[in-house]
């Protein structure tokens, strides 16, 4: 079941459910549930649930769950759960759980758990647990647990 808004381009596998906003591009694997806002690009693997807000760009592996805020970029591995705020960039490995606040930049390895505050930068190795406050910078190796308060490095 697919709905393509004005000017949109939808390619969807069997058993998928999706809505493509105006002037958006939506590519969805079978059994997936997808919603793309206007002027967005969304490519998602099978069995995934993804929402791409206006102007966002989402690429997500199978079995992933994610929401990309307006004008954000989200790249997520399979089985991951991702949320990116507006104007943010989020790249995360498979099986990871990551939240990127407005204006933040996250790069995280597989199996990691992290939250990046507004306008912060978070780089985390696999299997790590990371929390960065707003305007902070956090780089951590695999298997580590780190908390960076507001404005910290």
Over which residues does each language-model region extend?
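Thr-biased low-complexity repeat/linker tracts and other Thr-enriched repetitive architectures
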Residues: 1-153
């Amino acid at each position: 079941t697919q709905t393509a808004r004005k000017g949109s381009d939808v390619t969807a596998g069997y058993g998928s459910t999706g809505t493509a906003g105006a002037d958006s591009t939506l590519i969805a694997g079978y059994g997936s549930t997808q919603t793309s806002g206007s002027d967005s690009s969304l490519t998602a693997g099978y069995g995934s649930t993804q929402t791409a807000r206006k102007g966002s760009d989402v690429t997500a592996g199978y079995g992933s769950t994610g929401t990309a805020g307006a004008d954000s970029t989200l790249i997520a591995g399979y089985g991951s759960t991702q949320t990116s705020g507006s104007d943010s960039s989020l790249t995360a490995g498979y099986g990871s759980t990551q939240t990127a606040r407005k204006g933040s930049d996250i790069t995280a390895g597989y199996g990691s758990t992290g939250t990046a505050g507004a306008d912060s930068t978070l780089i985390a190795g696999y299997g790590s647990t990371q929390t960065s406050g707003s305007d902070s910078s956090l780089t951590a190796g695999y298997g580590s647990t780190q908390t960076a308060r507001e404005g910290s490095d």
